[in-house]
Amino acid sequence: MLESLNFHFAFYDWLLVFMVTALGVFSAYTKDPQLKAVAATIPIPCGFAYIAVGLPMGAANAISGFMCLLYVHIVRILHYKVKIPIIPSIALGLAFFVTLGTLLMPIVPDTEAMFLGVCAFDFTVGVILFQKQKYKSGVRYKTPLPVYIKAPAIAGVVSGLMVIKHLMGGFCTSFPMMNSIVSYESRYSLGDQCRQLPLFLIAGPIMFIEMRYLETLLHLNHWIVLLCGYALFACIYWPLNQELKRRNERADASYSGEKK
């Protein structure tokens, strides 16, 4: 009965809980808001969810990457514009993701055309946002709580989010577990989290394509597929992240010059 309710965790589920908790603790004690945002977009949780789910990368993975972008903007708008407290804002963002993912899961065709089309859409949106969005550095902040309180709290939240993993199917790999933790830890600088997501939309689809065809055409082991995906993602993400930092610095310098 517990297994049917998704309360049964396999080994890879526990490994995913550990990895997301570790990244969550890192984001909680890191003052740099841009580093917090990086923690939300590196695909370590995504990769371990891929191992745990055991499904090839497909259209659902690419769609859920874009849904993560919608999630962070929903949280930002609800918290900053509508003035809803951060925890209800995160809950509403997650409810949107789960509802949309659950509705799309049975109707999204897992065809090559759909997969490649969504990847192209994600990449295009990522490039446009990266070029057009406004840049500035956010508020530096780290949690005042001691780690022996913060770490178990994060682990409890992550474990609760894992309960719905199997419900999401392929959408699970980009389910915003890490983004939800970082949204709370970055509640004073949600703009940084939003500015970081286009980098994932640029690098993620290329990683998804590589991983799909390494698995379906070459029939490589999931771990080898994942490591190859990580390597390609890092080659794309790292220079983009360096450019993002430079743009933030230039925007801050320009703003300081205007004030003088």
Spans of features found by a protein language model:
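Selected transmembrane alpha-helices and immediately adjacent juxtamembrane segments
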Residues: K132-M168
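Cytoplasmic-side transmembrane-helix entry/capping segments in multi-pass membrane proteins
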Residues: K36-I42, K83-A95, M114-V118, V139-I149, ...
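Membrane-interface helix-loop-helix junctions at boundaries between adjacent transmembrane segments
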Residues: L55-L116
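A structural feature that tracks compact, well-ordered secondary-structure segments
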Residues: G24-I42, A52-G54, V157-M177, E185-R187
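N-terminal signal-anchor module of multipass membrane proteins
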Residues: M1-P33, A37
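Structural signature of hydrophobic alpha-helical transmembrane segments
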Residues: L5-V17, I51-L70, E112-D122, K165-P176
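C-terminal ends of transmembrane helices
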Residues: T21-K31, L70-I84, V127-S137, I181-G191, ...
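Hydrophobic alpha-helical transmembrane segments in multi-pass integral membrane proteins
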Residues: G101-P109, I154-L167, I206-W223
